[in-house]
Swiss-Prot record:
Annotated residues for binding of 2,4-dihydroxypteridine 2: C48, L49, T50, G62, I63, A64, P65, E66, S67, G101, H102, V103, K137
Matches recorded under Pfam families: Lum_binding (PF00677)
Pathway: Cofactor biosynthesis; riboflavin biosynthesis; riboflavin from 2-hydroxy-3-oxobutyl phosphate and 5-amino-6-(D-ribitylamino)uracil: step 2/2
Descriptive protein name: Riboflavin synthase
Gene Ontology terms for molecular function: riboflavin synthase activity
The Lumazine-binding repeat ranges on this chain: 1-97, 98-195
Gene name per UniProt: rib5
Segments traversing the membrane: none
Keyword Transport: no
Group of enzyme by EC: transferase
Stretches assigned to coiled coil: none
Amino acid sequence: MFTGLVEAIGVVKDVQGTIDNGFAMKIEAPQILDDCHTGDSIAVNGTCLTVTDFDRYHFTVGIAPESLRLTNLGQCKAGDPVNLERAVLSSTRMGGHFVQGHVDTVAEIVEKKQDGEAIDFTFRPRDPFVLKYIVYKGYIALDGTSLTITHVDDSTFSIMMISYTQSKVIMAKKNVGDLVNVEVDQIGKYTEKLVEAHIADWIKKTQA
């Protein structure tokens, strides 16, 4: 579990293919490795990954084929920056929202414009089904960053990034055409499942 508050920006040092068609990615991030252990969970661009090796300055994670299909991590190469967040502790302040690190899809930046010191981004998701879980003023995690929806329609959604956040995450430097990882707020998914089950149960009872 994560909060969507990025702790550090790491730098990809190496990416190697693995025999299971996945990747092994080595990331430089000494600022978050003081209490690192093999098996720890770290969100990389919002994707929950497991630490397989580490030293004082770097850690390595394995990226499964499913994660490569659903995320933008397959585009990462040596020198690229990535958002990083360690899994929450019981003492962690929940300053963002509950983020699982299970990316639903990617979205393309279709508009980026300055609004005073803030930046307005508009995105088109690759898989439109996620739009039903996105609501005005609701939460969304983009590349692991907890953000608030400012607009949503039948094909796109928008957020505003304040100047403070711009200096803490990688998305501020992304441009039109770039991809971001999308994880919608889980509350919508749970609500949908409960409602569907309730309706199905009601139909069975009325037809009995």
